[in-house]
């Protein structure tokens, strides 16, 4: 089957159409703006899969309806999913704009005095607003000379932020969320909302019963040679942690081997269900070989599966990581307990950064007073105002141990195309695999246990659905925290020490939900959250605006907030603008 091509970014150079000297004097400058924009994006941004982003430039500068239509015809044939219009001069507003209502679009009007690029920018944005097709405005802070071909830093930041978010929108469109199972333990996020995926994300939902996973395992609908490779890899790389089960629940060596084998098979089969596997076609299993075109998935697990079969912890942890027995590769997005809304937050983070995501319970707020009472030690540094214990039963990406290193040698989680095999091995070495606690998981399994290194910048996010309002996004930028070992051990043991832990300290603003750490915990909208590497809340805000998802909670600096220009017409309070604009325009793919 032919592979689906990746979305491209279309660059639209628009120009003053008056001949006999005006257009002719601007052709080279205008087209050079387009080429410079394309070069910047190609150099600085990759798709989440690691592929280089392709830009498609209109064949000619666009002065009016005819050339605009020719450009659109070219873009339609090239899978252009995002457009950036550029100009150094006055052009004819509504005659030259991109009118596709579902394609993210921005306009860069050159800030120069020789020709009024800013005037076109304002006129074109007015047309977009009047027609109900929001666009992003890009206008440099400082005046440039007409022959200055450089892209100022503030313009570059907006171009790249727009491009990252726009590509995320285009990449999700037409894909599916694979729901393996149904509602897990009454968790609302696993009540998968088809309308949300269809209307806001342009995606479909593929619902598959967990018996399909059982069938694939029992009937050997997988690559048997790959299973042997996976087992050998696990034998070489897995370090096993303590078995905290009572003696009557401990498994013998043969039983543990069977649990490991099934856990690895679950990873293989869920992956094959998501993206397909041509090896299955070679076995005559053509239908199963196709997969479900899933860009994200969720596995119910508890309790209808886990009461009798190994849990999903190992499978989910490995799929969510940037490496496995096949080496370093793009991480998958697989939500524990089929929490589709947390899965969407994971999907957003992965599409924006190319990195693995940490799925976690937002488990406990530890006040400085409570920590000192329990441990006899005081919190300090980033943790001085309190911490949030982010922990789940072992399904977080192993990258979350933060044994990868950035250019300055600091702990981080890299885009998968930058990860070395040595860094992948270091993450594995920092992970223990602990037998699942019988009281939770009667069918057994292995939970990954690691501790995230401290001082690493993270952005915690979550999507929630509010009846009568629709989806909303929560964002909390902060840092991982390293606690003294004795303190960590004592606090960790009060929850479950066989699971992975990140101690998180959000950045406080002294206002609203970020008045203090307790307020962050108290205002979080669900029991789960996602950690994405870096302080990238501004990118999430831009993406949410494109999809018409209002942001109900964030601690991003106001100067970094970048939304379509029409948002400014929806009131003077910046967050109220977001709600009113999202309500006014409705979901991007409204049905």
Swiss-Prot record:
It is an enzyme of class 5 (isomerase). It catalyses: L-fucose = L-fuculose. One of its GO terms (biological process) is L-fucose catabolic process. GO terms for cellular component: cytoplasm. It comes from the Bacteria. Keywords: Carbohydrate metabolism, Cytoplasm, Fucose metabolism, Isomerase, Manganese, Metal-binding. The active site is at residues 337, 361. Its cofactor is Mn(2+). Its EC number is 5.3.1.25. It is found in: Cytoplasm. It holds the Pfam family Fucose_iso_C. Pathway: Carbohydrate degradation; L-fucose degradation; L-lactaldehyde and glycerone phosphate from L-fucose: step 1/3. Mn(2+) binds at residues 337, 361, 528. GO terms for molecular function: arabinose isomerase activity; L-fucose isomerase activity; manganese ion binding. The keyword Cytoplasm applies. The keyword Manganese applies. InterPro entries: Fuc/Ara_isomerase_C, Fuc_iso_dom3_sf, Fuc_isomerase_C, Fucose_iso_dom1_sf, Fucose_iso_N1, Fucose_isomerase, Fucose_isomerase_dom2_sf, Fucose_isomerase_N/cen_sf. Homohexamer. NCBIfam families: fucI, PRK10991.1. HAMAP family: Fucose_iso (MF_01254). Converts the aldose L-fucose into the corresponding ketose L-fuculose. Belongs to the L-fucose isomerase family. This is L-fucose isomerase. It comes from Salmonella choleraesuis (strain SC-B67).
């Amino acid at each position: 089957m032919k592979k689906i091509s990746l979305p491209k970014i279309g660059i639209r150079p628009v120009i003053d159409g008056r001949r006999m000297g005006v257009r002719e004097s601007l052709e080279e400058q205008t087209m050079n703006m387009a080429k410079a924009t394309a070069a910047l994006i190609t150099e600085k941004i990759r798709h989440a899969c690691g592929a280089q982003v392709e830009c498609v430039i209109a064949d000619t500068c666009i002065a009016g309806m005819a050339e605009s239509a020719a450009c659109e015809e070219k873009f339609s044939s090239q899978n252009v999913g995002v457009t950036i219009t550029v100009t150094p001069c006055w052009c004819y507003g509504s005659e030259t704009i991109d009118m596709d209502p579902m394609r993210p679009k921005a306009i860069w009007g050159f800030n120069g005095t020789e020709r009024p690029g800013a005037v076109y920018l304002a006129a074109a944005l007015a047309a977009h607003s009047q027609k109900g097709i929001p666009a992003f405005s890009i206008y440099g802070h400082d005046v440039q000379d007409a022959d200055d071909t450089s892209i100022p830093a503030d313009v570059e930041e907006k171009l790249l932020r727009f491009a990252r978010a726009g590509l995320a929108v285009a990449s999700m469109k037409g894909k599916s969320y694979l729901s393996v199972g149904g509602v897990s333990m009454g968790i609302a996020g696993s009540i998968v909302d088809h309308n949300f995926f269809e209307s806001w994300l342009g995606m479909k939902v593929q619902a598959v019963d967990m018996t399909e996973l059982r069938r694939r395992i029992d009937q050997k609908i997988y690559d048997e040679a790959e299973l042997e490779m996976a087992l050998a890899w696990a034998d070489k790389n897995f370090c096993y942690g303590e078995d905290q089960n009572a003696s009557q629940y401990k498994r013998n060596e043969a039983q543990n081997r069977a649990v490991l084998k099934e856990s690895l098979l679950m990873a293989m089969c869920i992956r094959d269900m998501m993206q397909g596997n041509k090896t299955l076609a070679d076995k005559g299993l053509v239908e199963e070989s196709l997969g479900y075109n899933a860009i994200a998935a969720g596995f119910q697990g508890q309790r209808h599966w886990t009461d009798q079969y190994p849990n999903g912890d190992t499978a989910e942890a490995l799929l969510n990581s940037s490496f496995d027995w096949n080496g370093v590769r793009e991480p998958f997005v697989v939500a524990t307990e089929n929490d589709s809304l947390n899965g969407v937050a994971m999907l957003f983070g992965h599409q924006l950064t190319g990195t693995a995501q940490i799925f976690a319970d937002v488990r406990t707020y530890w006040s400085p007073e409570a920590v000192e009472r329990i441990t006899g030690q005081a919190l300090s540094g980033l943790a001085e105002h309190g911490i949030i214990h982010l922990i789940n039963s072992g399904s977080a990406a192993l990258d979350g141990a933060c044994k990868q290193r950035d250019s300055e040698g600091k702990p981080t989680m890299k885009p998968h195309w930058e990860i070395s095999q040595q860094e992948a091995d270091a993450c594995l070495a920092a992970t223990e695999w602990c037998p699942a606690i019988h009281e939770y998981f009667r069918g057994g399994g292995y939970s990954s246990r690691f501790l995230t290194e401290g001082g690493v910048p993270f952005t915690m996010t979550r999507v929630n659905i509010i009846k009568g309002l629709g989806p909303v996004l929560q964002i909390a930028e902060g840092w991982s925290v390293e606690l003294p070992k004795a303190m960590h051990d004592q606090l960790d043991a009060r929850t479950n020490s066989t699971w992975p832990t990140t101690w998180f300290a959000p950045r406080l603003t002294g206002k609203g939900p970020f008045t203090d750490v307790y307020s962050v915990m108290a205002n979080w909208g669900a029991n789960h959250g996602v950690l994405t590497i870096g302080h990238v809340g501004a990118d999430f805000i831009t993406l949410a605006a494109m999809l018409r998802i209002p942001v109900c909670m964030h601690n991003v600096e106001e100067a970094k907030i970048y939304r379509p220009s029409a948002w400014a017409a929806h009131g003077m309070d910046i967050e109220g603008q977001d709600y009113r604009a999202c309500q006014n325009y409705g979901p991007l793919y409204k049905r």
